[in-house]
Amino acid sequence: MDRIKCTVAYDGMHFCGYQIQPNHRTVQQEIEKALQKLHKGELVRVQASGRTDSTVHAKGQVIHFDTPLSLEEWQWSNALNTMLPDDIVIRQVEKKTEEFHARYGVEKKEYRYRVLLSKTADVFRRNYVYQYPYPLEINSIRKAIPYFIGTHDFTSFCSAKTDKKDKVRTIYEIELIEQDDEIIFRFVGNGFLYNMVRIIVGTLLSVGQGKLDPDSIPEILAKQNRQFAGKMAPGHGLYLWEVNYNN
């Protein structure tokens, strides 16, 4: 058996998230459907670095699966991309040992969130950026960002629906990039709770709008209560950008 690692990109707009759900189109479902065809009807389960929500995009999602088929890496890439729909692309294929695990071997993840600063919607970017029509004080956002960096209990910044009991995570970097009429938030951490990036982005936008003080972030973290943080930003501005592994 070979263990195959794939780096996957997808446009999340027409998916109900990554993970298989009955009666809904998902990324995992489409990948496993393609693998089933390649394996002559045999079901092949894939493991992913993590789940993404409905409408969330990925540039660097990582999956693995085990297979009895002996194909070269380029053959896997070509075969899967031929069978997958246009909104999923296998960017890279690597053969790994059985010690590799797409989920349990993750060292850090990078997410990016795009915000379009415009009162007018952009018809070509509407599915890929969060259009924000209100003026923002960027310096206030920059002042708030360092409070999130480090190891914290992020209960205040995750969905109540999360199934994780341990809410402690480490954020290594948060960068605010100003690019033409967009601002891009770049997050690097050892892991992220359900909706965590989107809630932090929503909170930072509230800071930029003057609804929250930058220096209130430590208090919000300490309260460990979701109701004190800002609104959650929508899914379509979020990208799973890159996943790094221990080995």
UniProtKB/Swiss-Prot annotation:
Official protein name in the record: tRNA pseudouridine synthase A 1
Cysteines engaged in disulfide bonds, as pairs: none
Catalytic activity: uridine(38/39/40) in tRNA = pseudouridine(38/39/40) in tRNA
Membrane-traversing stretches: none
Gene3D superfamilies per UniProt: Pseudouridine synthase I, catalytic domain, C-terminal subdomain, Pseudouridine synthase I, catalytic domain, N-terminal subdomain
Subunit structure: Homodimer.
GO BP terms in the entry: tRNA pseudouridine synthesis
Sequence positions that bind substrate: 111
GO-annotated molecular function: pseudouridine synthase activity; RNA binding; tRNA pseudouridine(38-40) synthase activity
Species in which this protein is naturally found: Bacillus cereus (strain ATCC 14579 / DSM 31 / CCUG 7414 / JCM 2152 / NBRC 15305 / NCIMB 9373 / NCTC 2599 / NRRL B-3711)
Active-site residues (renumbered): 53 (nucleophile)
Family: Belongs to the tRNA pseudouridine synthase TruA family.
Function as written in the Swiss-Prot or TrEMBL entry: Formation of pseudouridine at positions 38, 39 and 40 in the anticodon stem and loop of transfer RNAs.
Keywords carried by this UniProt record: Isomerase, tRNA processing
Domain of life according to the entry: Bacteria
EC number in record: 5.4.99.12
Top EC group: isomerase
